[in-house]
Design a protein with these regions (language model features):
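Secretory targeting signals
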Residues: 1-3
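N-terminal export signals
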Residues: 7-26
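Secondary-structure end/capping motifs
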Residues: 236-324
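Short, glycine-/small- and polar/acidic-enriched structural segments
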Residues: 28-176, 180-186, 190-196, 212-220, ...
Length: 357
């Protein structure tokens, strides 16, 4: 049985409610609650490797329980980390690097890259006359939100192709998930710039779209990170390591068996399953959403450890935006990676294969 567009709309509407309710699993009173800031308006499968450690037992092993908080936009997460309103948040260079260039980068630091480039694409309606990025001149490009990552990243890609993102195209905010696909389907926009899991939601709703071929020498920008206050490296180091290790383990779990990871996500947030769907159908919906994302959990660089940060990503993005940044040392650190990745990978893989919930 195929999931209908109505079912998927009901499911995406439930993501927000699920985030407010929180995962339906017992929380031990002695575990520290980690407030985790997410730069979107509702819970969605794109952060699956950051949250399923709760139900898989990885968080408990590190003596914490997670409380995700959807803060609406990535800049809001940045502010929340600085103010101490969240303990750990998702760091996005497109919002942090301009601050660093102006000498306004504050007390935060990126310490683990939980998803690597490149996860954005541009799609058009099937049969469109737009066949390449070069054909986008003079067109309306939709983005979910101007606070979303696809907006600054796609602007950078257009710049690399000598297309002026301010003069040569028009940008339109069309909403997250299925509404973005509907805008494309109805002709409100000529093309849609979005990220992998967002396209998965649109595909699951049965909306047709055609991916434009990616340009050659695509800039390796747009990785996303775990970010916390620098003071935590000293004052709460074990917590940062534990959260990073949970994300790393969850990433390995998903790579070993994506369906098992989808089941774990649905156990945490059963409200997100399409209404009236069977377990199999609900798992399929999550798998469609995360299918492209999972392979980006591993670094695309030779001999790099999972979660390690490559400074060249920041340098490339800074150059594309004309930012003068002489020193990136206060922006990120790899000092926790060896400890984070110190666990039995084969044990995690075996757990995924045996997962029968």
């Amino acid at each position: 049985m195929q999931i209908t567009r109505r079912q998927w709309l009901q499911a995406t509407g439930a993501f927000a409610a699920a985030l407010a309710i929180g995962p339906r699993i017992a929380r031990a009173a002695e575990l520290k609650t980690v407030r985790f800031g997410i730069g979107q308006k509702a819970m969605a499968p794109n952060v699956i490797n950051c949250v399923i450690g709760e139900v898989l037992g990885y968080n408990k092993e590190e003596n914490f329980t997670v409380k995700p908080q959807a803060l609406g936009g990535n800049s809001n997460v940045q502010v929340a980390v600085e103010r101490g309103d969240v303990d750990i948040g998702i760091g996005v260079p497109s919002f942090g690097l301009p601050l660093l260039a102006k000498g306004e980068w504050g007390s935060a630091i990126n310490y683990y890259e939980y998803t690597y480039p490149y996860k954005w694409d541009i799609v058009v309606k099937p049969g469109s006359t737009i066949k390449s990025y070069a054909d986008l001149k003079g067109k309306k490009i939709g983005v979910s939100d101007f606070a979303g990552t696809e907006y600054p990243v796609t602007r950078n890609v257009l710049k690399s192709l000598q297309i002026d993102p301010d003069k040569d195209v028009k940008w339109v905010a069309v909403g997250n998930g299925v509404p973005a696909g509907v805008a494309l389907d109805r002709g409100a926009i000529d093309a849609l710039a979005y990220y992998d899991t967002g396209f998965g939601q649109i595909e699951a709703a049965g909306i047709g779209m055609q991916f434009l071929p990616r340009p050659k020498d695509l800039p390796m920008v747009g990785g996303q990170f775990l970010m916390a206050k620098k003071s935590m490296l000293k004052d709460n180091r074990a917590l940062l390591i534990g959260f990073g290790r949970s994300v790393s383990k969850a990433s390995r779990f998903l790579l070993a068996d994506p369906a098992a990871g989808a089941k774990a996500f649905l156990e945490m947030y059963p409200e997100t399953a399409p209404r009236g769907s069977s377990t199999e159908e609900a798992v399929k919906a999550v798998l469609v959403a995360i299918g492209r994302r999972i392979k980006l959990y591993e670094p695309p660089y030779p001999n790099a450890k999972m979660g390690s940060i490559n400074a060249q990503e920041f340098k490339t993005e800074a150059e594309l935006n004309g930012l003068k940044i002489p020193d990136y040392s206060g922006f990120f650190t790899n000092e926790l990676i060896d400890t984070i990745d110190n666990y039995d990978v084969k044990k995690i893989q075996a757990q995924a294969v045996a997962y029968k919930r």
